[in-house]
Amino acid sequence: TGGPGVGKTTIVRAIVALMSAKMRRVALAAPTGRAAKRLGESTGAVAMTLHRLLEFQPRTQSFARGAHDPLPADAVVVDEMSMVDTELFRALVAAMPVSAQLVLVGDVDQLPSVGPGAVLSDVIASGCATVVELTEIFRQAAASKIVVSAHRINRGELPDLDSAPGGDSDFYFISRE
């Protein structure tokens, strides 16, 4: 987990490269089409929505993949995990092969799921999984006042409000009179 610009995508790219080098099958998924597309573009691998990965059947409102027919993967990486609700996560866990690894990637301070539950936060709080929290801002994100301000706010600090509209900054404070 970690905020914007801390290297979550870089870590996922490295996981995919390492697993591929070991001839292991990696499935990449995200809760939305847009997030899946970004995940695929950033890793150079095929990524899909969780519903597509689990082979959602609209007629029966169920998934074809489950304990009876697990996913053909040695590892499953789910990005934007904060948007996954409990029902979808339950279906994913049920479809995991016994020996497969599950990697959950997301920012607990980002968009919550529309459906019930705060799965990523709950998994982290449970202590049942190994958690890596990335905190250092890298590359172009370090120059973005939006990213820096978001991190400051998450730490309970005030952002730098000195930027004037029309300047070189990407973050402005507009005073209301």
Give residue ranges: language-model regions:
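Post-Walker A helix-loop "phosphate-sensing" segment adjacent to the P-loop in P-loop NTPases
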Residues: A17-A27
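Conserved P-loop NTPase motor core of helicases/translocases
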Residues: R25-A30, R34-A95, E136-I137, I146-V147, ...
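Walker A (P-loop) phosphate-binding loop of P-loop NTPases
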Residues: G5
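Short, conserved "post-DEAD/DEAH" coupling segment immediately C-terminal to helicase motif II
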Residues: T86-A100, A118-V123
